[in-house]
């Protein structure tokens, strides 16, 4: 009896691989049949042309995007190189302005009377300091650093720093009437704003009342 049970079990084990192979063959046959059906389906020339046209349009869009990205990268690189060339010495130039200020203070410490009465040694020293300052400023200017001396100009908060106000009836309001310390720029960037005194309330400045009256009169009233 045990022998019969073993034979039945063995028979089932032998049939299991056969069933799996049959299922695999069925799947493969189904896939081949589907592919054959696809090949058998006729594709019109119009469909082919439409598909090719769409692919061509997609390629054009990708090419345009790539061209635009490359152009933007080229412009950005050029701008970065130009900025590095112009502004690369900004920190160094700012530090050198302190040296120039000290030279100027040294010159201001020697009065005109003292210079007139000075011996040849002191005169030579003063002239040497003046030449050094001029050479330093000329070198900075060759590298794009420009001096801002706005005396008599309208106050501009982008380039000037107001230190005090001066009542002055002879000039328009917000006119720079005194430069305490000149400013410097490099390119369109401010290295140091000019420290200035600004006029307050001159009669040449148009009053709000007069402006309002002229606006109310219009062109005919003017």
Curated annotation (Swiss-Prot):
Cellular component aspect of the GO annotation: cytoplasm
Region of interest called Disordered, as start-end residue ranges on this chain: 1-21, 200-222
Gene Ontology molecular function, alphabetical: adenyl-nucleotide exchange factor activity; protein homodimerization activity; protein-folding chaperone binding; unfolded protein binding
Compartments, record wording: Cytoplasm
Keyword annotations of the record: Chaperone, Cytoplasm, Stress response
Single GO biological process annotation from the record: protein folding
Subunit structure: Homodimer.
Family: Belongs to the GrpE family.
HAMAP family recorded: GrpE
Protein name per the record: Protein GrpE
Source organism (scientific name): Chelativorans sp. (strain BNC1)
């Amino acid at each position: 009896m045990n022998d019969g049970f073993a034979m039945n079990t063995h028979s089932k084990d032998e049939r299991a691989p056969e069933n799996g192979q049959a299922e695999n063959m069925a799947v493969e046959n189904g896939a081949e049949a589907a592919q054959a059906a696809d090949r058998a389906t006729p594709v019109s020339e119009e469909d082919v042309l439409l598909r090719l046209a769409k692919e061509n349009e997609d390629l054009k869009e990708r090419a345009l995007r790539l061209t635009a990205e490359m152009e933007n990268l080229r412009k950005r690189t050029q701008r970065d190189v130009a900025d590095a060339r112009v502004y690369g010495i900004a920190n160094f130039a700012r530090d050198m302005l302190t040296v120039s200020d000290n030279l100027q203070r040294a010159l201001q410490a020697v009065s005109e009377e003292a210079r007139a009465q000075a011996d040849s040694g002191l005169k030579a020293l003063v002239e040497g300091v003046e030449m050094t300052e001029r050479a330093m400023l000329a070198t900075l200017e060759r590298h794009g650093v420009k001096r801002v001396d706005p005396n008599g100009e309208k106050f501009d908060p982008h380039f000037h720093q107001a230190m005090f106000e001066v009542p002055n009836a002879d000039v328009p309001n917000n006119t720079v009437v005194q430069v305490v310390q000149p400013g410097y720029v490099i390119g369109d960037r401010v290295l140091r704003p000019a420290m200035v005194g600004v006029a307050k309330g001159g009669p040449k400045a148009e009053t709000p009342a007069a402006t309002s009256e002229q606006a109310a009169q219009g062109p005919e009233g003017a």
